[in-house]
């Protein structure tokens, strides 16, 4: 398959990203909603993948069932797109889909978080089922800018301000990659138009009841028009700089963990309560954020002040707090136990 825009930044980013990934031979899963970003990623991957390096491309579509017939139309669109992609490329392209229960997504405070968790849980299961070592999602530099701004508003620490990582572990043996993280939505739109490829628009992206949408539709345009036209690039670049700095924090957090962590009990992390008193609160706060990231526990919903409060109080006898995602921190006589309830 030869795209018309061979020198497109989209193709170059995907090509370089693939070259940086290990263990891709067994196949790559790519999440495709039908929107511009994911359609662009799937098409670029199909153009760049070679049989000798990647055996198959698995397109994974999640039907959230939140918009009824529109969700079903998205699913049908992606299926047809994949059929055309299969015809135009030598790469084996498989289609996988799941329909979620909308009632389960409406439980608790955030539909967005429930939907995201459901998606990534399914991606994890699918990776194990298909024996794929990588799951790719179509996050862009625009998403990065929104994420950094959202986390600034929530008072995130340094690791939070590093934004979306280009690569991270999804589950043991499976990586989560964002090949388009340094491409803008405008570049992806141009790439698809050059290749006469259409995509679907999700009307829920215009609903400002979701914080990310409100930032994208209201706050970022205000900052761009009134203060700094290049604000998205600046925020995305800031995330890159902080990501480099956060690696130093991670090393420090690991050293702290070696002195605090005791043998875990199933899914519970156990800390030496007496050893906690040897560390200042800022180091404990840093360690906790690193621990939550490592364990894949919800981290974005916890504000900077809450991290400080927990670090200050967690060594106190009888301390207990319940956090987002069902995570509990409980202080006992000699230990502090953290984990799902």
Predicted segments, located by residue:
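Single-residue recognition of alpha-helix capping/boundary positions
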Residues: 187, 231, 303-306
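Core alpha/beta nucleotide-donor-binding catalytic domains of modification enzymes
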Residues: 1-217
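AMP-forming adenylation/ATP pyrophosphatase catalytic core
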Residues: 2-37, 53-54, 58, 62, ...
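Short, surface-exposed loop/turn segments at secondary-structure junctions
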Residues: 202-206, 229-232, 301
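Internal, active-site/partner-interface "lid" segment
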Residues: 205-212, 233-243
């Amino acid at each position: 398959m030869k795209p018309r825009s061979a020198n497109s930044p989209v193709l170059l980013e995907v090509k370089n990203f693939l070259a940086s990934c290990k263990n891709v031979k067994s196949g790559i899963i790519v999440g495709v909603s039908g929107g511009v970003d994911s359609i662009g990623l799937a098409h670029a991957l199909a153009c760049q993948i070679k049989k000798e390096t990647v055996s198959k491309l698995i397109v994974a579509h999640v039907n959230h069932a939140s918009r009824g017939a529109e969700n079903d139309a998205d699913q049908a669109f992606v299926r047809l797109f994949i059929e055309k992609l299969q015809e135009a490329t030598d790469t084996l392209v498989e289609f996988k889909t799941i329909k979620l229960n909308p009632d389960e997504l409406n439980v608790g405070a955030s539909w967005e978080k429930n939907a995201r968790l459901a998606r990534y849980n399914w991606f994890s299961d699918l990776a194990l089922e298909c024996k794929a070592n990588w799951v790719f999602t179509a996050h862009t530099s625009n998403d990065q800018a929104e994420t950094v701004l959202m986390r600034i508003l929530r008072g995130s620490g340094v690791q939070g301000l590093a934004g979306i990582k280009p690569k991270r572990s999804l589950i043991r043996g499976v990586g989560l990659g964002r090949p388009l993280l340094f491409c803008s939505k405008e570049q992806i739109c141009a790439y698809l138009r050059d290749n006469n490829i259409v995509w679907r628009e999700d009307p829920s992206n215009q609903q400002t009841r979701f914080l990310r949408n409100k930032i994208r539709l209201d706050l970022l345009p205000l900052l761009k028009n009134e203060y700094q036209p290049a604000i998205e690039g600046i925020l995305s670049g800031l995330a890159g700089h902080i990501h480099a700095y956060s690696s130093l924090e991670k090393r420090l957090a690991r050293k702290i963990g070696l002195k605090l962590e005791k043998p875990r009990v199933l899914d519970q992390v156990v800390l030496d309560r007496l050893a906690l008193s040897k560390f200042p609160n800022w180091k404990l706060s840093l360690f906790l954020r690193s621990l939550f990231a490592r364990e894949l526990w919800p981290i974005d919903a916890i504000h900077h002040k809450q991290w400080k409060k927990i670090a200050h109080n967690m060594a106190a006898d009888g301390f207990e707090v319940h956090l987002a995602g069902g995570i509990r921190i409980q202080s006992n006589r000699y230990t502090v136990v953290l984990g799902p309830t």
